[in-house]
Each structure stands twice: as structure tokens, then as C-alpha cells.
Amino acid sequence: MSAATAKYGILVGVDGSAQSNAAVAWAAREAVMRQLPITLLHIVAPVVVGWPVGQLYANMTEWQKDNAQQVIEQAREALTNSLGESKPPQVHTELVFSNVVPTLIDASQQAWLMVVGSQGMGALGRLLLGSISTALLHHARCPVAIIHSGNGATPDSDAPVLVGIDGSPASEAATALAFDEASRRRVDLVALHAWTDLGMFPVLGMDWREREKREAEVLAERLAGWQEQYPDVRVHRSLVCDKPARWLLEHSEQAQLVVVGSHGRGGFSGMLLGSVSSAVAHSVRIPVIVVRPS
């Protein structure tokens, strides 16, 4: 979905945790940078009881509503504090009483980007947001940004954007977004192509030098069109014969943002980047955007 037609613009799942507030702050800066509306969405799982409880049920429901309003207000405050005098075009808030994961996945169909904290407390403290973010990585219909508390780069950071490239459709979509992010942030782009998931061990019968030459050509071809479209972005290529997740984690220590595809192939056909994206999203300490193919 294009940014212009996305109802929610940048959609942030909020729950009152420190990670949630960090997600709001990051999303707010992204909304200002892109001039997109931002929507703060808090979902409360309905109270489920196995027997009539009368006033107890009513009290619990009322407590949920009061607590939910506090979460929304806290998210608004986090947004305001993160921006200073800057403001996104529009700020919307939504409070929904429903099951958390299905509601977020459904809402993602109308968002340009969904942003969530890496971990936090779900409805009534029963559901870790870590499990929610994992579900979104696999099922959301838009790119998903995973934000860790207190470890994101500062808004004026000159650290590069890091993108993982493997040649899959999801990787191509990730490359497009990574170039755009680097251009808007006015920073360099590091393009990492790790072309095997077997580790740095020789395989009998394979000409590794010839394979490396071919993989370097593939990486150059994948980047050529985007470098023409974004001549302002300086690109650093990194080609390694090793596991993608390992090198993405290592390179992320000098980056401000990591962008990867949701699914693709690893070094060989059939090795899904899905496992790589999940590992990176939950291990890297900087913001990670996981992109689905268009």
C-alpha cells in the first residue's frame, strides 16, 4: 500500500511499556520525516469469565477502560516529548477491545508501516509484546518496525542504514525502502550480501572463488538501478560467505537502522530469510524494519 492511500499512515501498537514508548518516539520522528499521519493504537483483550460475576465483571471492564485511556495519554506524551517543536501532519488515537494479534494484523492492511516495541506487556499483563511482534513479522500486510527501548540511534545520527540483500522479492522491497531511508536521513547505506547459510566451511566440489565472483556480480546488479535512482546515497558493499544473521548482527553495531526482507532465500534455494529476519529483529539493539514483497 502506498503512503498516500494508507488510512493509518504509520501505525504504532502501544501498551504503556518502555519499549512501547520507544516505538512511539521512533515512529513520531519517522512520521515527521515522511510527512505522514501517525496512529496510536491500543488494543485491550476482552475479559473472559467462565461464570456470572455481576459487579466484579463490570468493575474489571471499567478498570480496563480507565487503564487504556492512561496508556493512550502516555503514548501521546511520549510522542510530544520526542519531537519538540516538530509535529507530524496528523495524530490519531484508537482504542479497541478485541484480541490483540488478529486486530493488529487486520489493521496492518490499512497502514504504510506498523511499529511495535520489541517486548512489553500485552493486555492485562498476560501476553508479551515479544510474541506479538513475532506474529506480526510473519503475518502483517505492511512493513513492520521493531524498536528496542533506549538503544535507537539519535535523530541526528550519521551512522549508516544497513540492508540485507539475497535476491528474493522481499529483499528487493527491503532494498527499495533502505535506499529511501538512507536518502531521507542523509546517511550512507551498507548493503550486505551473505551468500550461504552453512557457515564458513568448505563444501566438496564447489569452486568458492568462482561462486564469490558470481555473487559479487549479483550484488552489483541488485544495487545498480537503485544507485541511479538515489545518486545522493553512498553505498558500501559487503560480501561474505557466511550466515546472514551473524553478519547483520555484527554490522548493526555501527548502523542506525537495519532493513531486511520478511522471507527470501538464504545462501541456497529453500533456506528462508524468514528465520534470518526473526533472529535479527529480536537480537539487534537498533530499530529493524522487516519488509514484505510488494
UniProtKB/Swiss-Prot annotation:
Positions bound to ATP 1: G13, G117, S118, Q119, G120, M121, G122, A123, S131, I132
Knockout-associated phenotype: No visible phenotype under normal or hypoxic and normoxic stationary phase growth.
Induction: Constitutively expressed during exponential phase, normoxic and hypoxic stationary phase.
Transmembrane segment boundaries: none
Annotated positions binding ATP 2: G164, D197, G261, S262, H263, G264, R265, G266, G267, S275, V276, S277
GO molecular function, one term: ATP binding
SUPFAM superfamilies registered for this protein in UniProt: Adenine nucleotide alpha hydrolases-like (SSF52402)
Keyword ATP-binding among record annotations: yes
Domain of life (superkingdom): Bacteria
Keyword field: ATP-binding, Nucleotide-binding
UniProt cross-references to Pfam families, sorted A to Z: Usp (PF00582)
Gene3D superfamilies: HUPs
Protein family per UniProt: Belongs to the universal stress protein A family.
Leftover remarks: Was identified as a high-confidence drug target.
Protein name (Swiss-Prot/TrEMBL): Universal stress protein Rv2026c
Species of the source: Mycobacterium tuberculosis (strain ATCC 25618 / H37Rv)
Highest classification ranks of the organism: Bacteria, Bacillati, Actinomycetota, Actinomycetes, Mycobacteriales
